[in-house]
């Protein structure tokens, strides 16, 4: 089987500050679903468990992922490893995935997974940090799964449309 990519393609967005990768990636999901991304912060602000204006300045914590997904009407997963065939089927069923992790020591980050080749175990993703040419990157599922124990134990560290 060849690389499966979500359709329509995700429109890449650059994050404006070092703490807003989570927000830029949510915006990409909203735009992909043809929903108004300006509603993200107001919807989150309605939750007693979230402080989105603080989060814009400080990033998203693992404990804020599940409440964020719930506030925005997103599905959530992420506690454990994923597998190429499972990820491919998830992309086919739900579209792009918001994924939080710590791929560099002491630097949590969020990306949007846009494609997967189940035979090769490779993915395509959008990294919103300093992505000046607004391109997709490539990696393998093992890289995706090496996102740090804290994030891999966080239900909600992967979000998607239901």
Which residues does each predicted region cover?
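Conserved active-site-adjacent core of cysteine acyl-enzyme catalytic domains
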Residues: 5-6, 44-162
């Amino acid at each position: 089987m060849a690389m499966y990519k979500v359709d329509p393609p995700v429109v890449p967005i650059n994050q404006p500050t070092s703490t807003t990768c989570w927000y830029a990636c949510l915006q990409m999901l909203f735009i992909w679903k043809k929903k108004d991304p300006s509603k993200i912060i107001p919807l989150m602000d309605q939750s007693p468990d979230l402080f989105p204006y603080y989060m814009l300045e400080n990033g998203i914590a693992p404990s804020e992922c599940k409440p964020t997904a719930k506030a925005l009407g997103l599905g959530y997963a992420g506690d454990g490893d994923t597998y190429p065939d499972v990820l491919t089927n998830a992309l086919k069923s739900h579209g792009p995935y918001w994924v939080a992790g710590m791929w560099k020591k002491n630097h949590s980050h969020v990306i949007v997974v846009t494609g997967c080749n189940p035979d090769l175990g490779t993915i395509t993703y959008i990294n919103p940090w300093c992505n000046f040419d607004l391109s997709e990157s490539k990696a393998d599922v093992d890289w995706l799964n090496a996102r740090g124990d804290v994030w891999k134990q966080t239900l909600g560290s992967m979000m998607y449309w239901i």
